[in-house]
Amino acid sequence: MTRLPAATLAQLEAAGVEAGRPLLISDADEVLFRFVETFVDHIEERGYSFDWSSFRLTGNVRRTSDGAVLDQPQVFALLQHFFAERAEDIPPVPGAAEALARLARAGVQIVVLTNIPVAQRDARRAALARNRMPYPVVVNTGDKGPAAAWLASRAGGPAVFIDDGPNNHASVKQAAPGIACLHFVATERLARLVEKPPEADGRPEDWPTLEREIAASLGLTCGGT
């Protein structure tokens, strides 16, 4: 297994995953929270626009005054500013909290694995709790495969991974092929810009369908209302 940074490993240990229970590892942005629409509103208020021409941020953010495309460091700076100001204010995806609550009652342990800046970890936890999703949060850096593999190894049973990013599905399948990967993008306009990655085991389009596929992958009888 790939060596994990000490800070990430400490968070994984603190997540409290128990052996012998089914595990759900969920991304936050575009799975639990409506990130892209909120980010676009944020940058438009500050003199930028979003092209919606591809499934990526870099290359799609332009300065409204002259149409200049922002490069990766500039987009990263906008993201840092966005999360510093709005991490607690991003609206939840409809149906996510209710579905997770039903899965938790059925015995599923849930961990939120997010690549939000480390400085906003507490804000993300607060936002999740306020929106009835009080689950452990692990702030990851880079590909999520090593962290997901660690969590699944600790659980020792069926595990499901949900993420909007194709690269993370590739990373997880490489690190832990036994994890069921479900590709989910909450914002329909963004979802149209990306195909299901070949490593993903499913591509549900809404939370009722996603809940049913999670339950089926974990061998449960609940799911999907």
Language-model-detected regions and their locations in the chain:
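Active-site neighborhood of HAD-like aspartate-dependent phosphohydrolases
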Residues: 1-72
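Glycine-rich phosphate-binding loop signature in dinucleotide/nucleotide-binding domains
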Residues: 18-19, 106-108, 152-158
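Metal-dependent phosphoesterase signature
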Residues: 62-95
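Substrate-recognition element of Asp-dependent hydrolases with the DxDx(T/V) motif
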Residues: 87-92, 96-127, 137-139
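Substrate-recognition "cap/lid" segment bordering the active-site pocket of phosphatases
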Residues: 117-160, 166-175
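Short acidic-hydrophobic, aromatic-tinged amphipathic segments that line or gate anion-handling sites
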Residues: 136-142, 199-209
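Short, charged, surface-exposed secondary-structure boundary motifs
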Residues: 146-149, 190-198, 213-215
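Acidic, Mg2+-coordinating phosphoryl-transfer loop and its flanking beta/alpha structural elements
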Residues: 161-205
